[in-house]
Swiss-Prot record:
UniProt-recorded name of the protein: Tetraspanin-12
Main location: membrane
Extracellular topological domain residue ranges: 34-59, 111-224
Domain of life (superkingdom): Eukaryota
Function comment: Regulator of cell surface receptor signal transduction. Plays a central role in retinal vascularization by regulating norrin (NDP) signal transduction. Acts in concert with norrin (NDP) to promote FZD4 multimerization and subsequent activation of FZD4, leading to promote accumulation of beta-catenin (CTNNB1) and stimulate LEF/TCF-mediated transcriptional programs.
Family, similarity comment: Belongs to the tetraspanin (TM4SF) family.
Membrane topology designation: Multi-pass membrane protein
Outcome when changing C83S: Impairs interaction with ADAM10
Source species of the chain: Homo sapiens (Human)
PANTHER family linked to this entry: TETRASPANIN (PTHR19282), TETRASPANIN-12 (PTHR19282:SF462)
Gene name tied to this protein: TSPAN12
Biological classification of the source: Eukaryota, Metazoa, Chordata, Craniata, Vertebrata
Reported effect, C12S: Impairs interaction with ADAM10
GO cellular component, one term: plasma membrane
Compartment list: Cell membrane
Amino acid sequence: MAREDSVKCLRCLLYALNLLFWLMSISVLAVSAWMRDYLNNVLTLTAETRVEEAVILTYFPVVHPVMIAVCCFLIIVGMLGYCGTVKRNLLLLAWYFGSLLVIFCVELACGVWTYEQELMVPVQWSDMVTLKARMTNYGLPRYRWLTHAWNFFQREFKCCGVVYFTDWLEMTEMDWPPDSCCVREFPGCSKQAHQEDLSDLYQEGCGKKMYSFLRGTKQLQVLRFLGISIGVTQILAMILTITLLWALYYDRREPGTDQMMSLKNDNSQHLSCPSVELLKPSLSRIFEHTSMANSFNTHFEMEEL
């Protein structure tokens, strides 16, 4: 009974862990898909600069095809573990354990590789100034993708220019910054702000924002936390799976052992009952002789008196 309760507890824990696998894997895929589009605009601005290499080494492992494939495979493995737990199938649970072990090794290798790569390309503040070279083609029909990337970055990071908003006046033939530099954006807002109130423009340059971006965003921290959580959950799932495999295998062997023990007990009972019946006459004779001896001794003592 206690063993059966333990098996039920292990199965419930595996159900919960598989649910966590699904939720965390879907979360990683969703955030990675969002960051993939986000990074496309950042890489457009940093193309052919030292900053581009740093961005790739910092964020590429997050959206790496291997990482995406691991999360997709983990969802399938979670379904495999769920089916094996429901049906108490030793083969499915063994496949589940092996798959988790392989996925964990791949994730560990990716984590070590990412850590080593991040240490290889240090980025200095002076590297951010090189982004000014990407401003000269802003607004040209041939470089609409670059214009879109600059507008996207300035809106998202609430910045203007590289060092200051005057970079647009220095590096281009524009008389005022783009409208994406406005705190409250509307058509012609930058011209109005440049002529009336400069405080309506973002005062901080995008170089500092890019430098902070390379140090890690909240989304990157969330993904790293999810990656560590998935790894820890995998270790717990592997331990519980091994324990459940052992318990189910022991339960399948136990009924045969109990049957053999019951047969031995039945045989001993069958053997003991006839022997007791055979010993009953002998015991009765011994009891009669003992009673006669006691009565003779009592009679002899009475005659002496």
